[in-house]
Amino acid sequence: MLAAWRIDVAALRCIGLAFPGLVDPIHNRVISTNEKYDDACSISLDKWAWENWEVPFCMDNDARLAVAGEWWQGAARGKNNVVMMTIGTGIGTGVVIDGRLLYGQHFQAGSLGGHFVLDYKGRRCSCGNNGCVEALSSSFFLPTIVREHALLSESFKRDADVYDFKRIFRLAQEGDEDALLIRNECMDIWASAIITYIHAYDPEVVILGGGILKSQEVIIPYISKRVDELAWCPSGKVPIVPAILGDDAALFGLEYFMVKQQQNERICI
């Protein structure tokens, strides 16, 4: 990786990792992986970084680092209360409250927005709950969503395993009624999740991220309309905006994290 980026090893000052699981960033350890990279919980990454590179190491949850990046240098720059929802294989979230990243007692606050339950009788999620946002509307569950949908044609269901959101949105744009139904139902679920985040965290702005935002011209107006109609916001509408840093958001978040660590500044609440 260093060679690919043409970085001299001698110039290396710190190693950072954005990890898709619950992370203790104080002790640089993975707490829980939800059946992904389970061996990570037993690895001393601090030790690995020092033994191999003789540099300090830092890490955090990938979605939390993404919101940190967008807050520091991206779509939420200048704001103090921010929620970011990243739509992809799963549903990731990160939260900034009063100018600090939200962690909670056990470092999981703000990170589990994909596992907020919207339908307690709904589809079983990988976390063990029923009807989580992720189980109802993520890319990982999309083939299952298609196969189990009672209103879709059998011809559409036959290709369930090859569907991703890019294809669903393209087919919907071309007028395919089955794809349009799935697309709109998923956007309704994302809107419902955002309404819940707004009620829980009272943000100034909500950021949407993930590769699916290549269709932001469809997603942002649709979700904004639903949220404006249904969210309880006496102080006014909460803007929903696309992320602007793309896949680099978490890298900017890591940079923010490293800078604050070197300055011995507190970054969390």
What are these model-predicted stretches?
Residues 2-6, 68-73, 184-198, 228, ...:
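Generic structural signal for well-ordered alpha-helical scaffold segments
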Residues 3-15, 21-81, 218-229, 233:
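Glycine-rich phosphate-binding loop and adjoining helix at the ATP-binding site
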Residues 20-23, 88-90, 212:
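Short glycine-rich anion-binding loops that position phosphate/pyrophosphate groups of nucleotides
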Residues 58-71, 213-269:
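Glycine-rich phosphate-binding/hydrolytic loop that grips phosphoryl groups
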Residues 77-136:
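Glycine-rich phosphate-binding loop of actin/hexokinase-like ATP-binding domains
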Residues 87, 139-140, 210-211:
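Short secondary-structure boundary segments
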Residues 133-207:
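A mobile "lid/hinge" subdomain adjacent to the ATP/sugar-phosphate binding pocket shared
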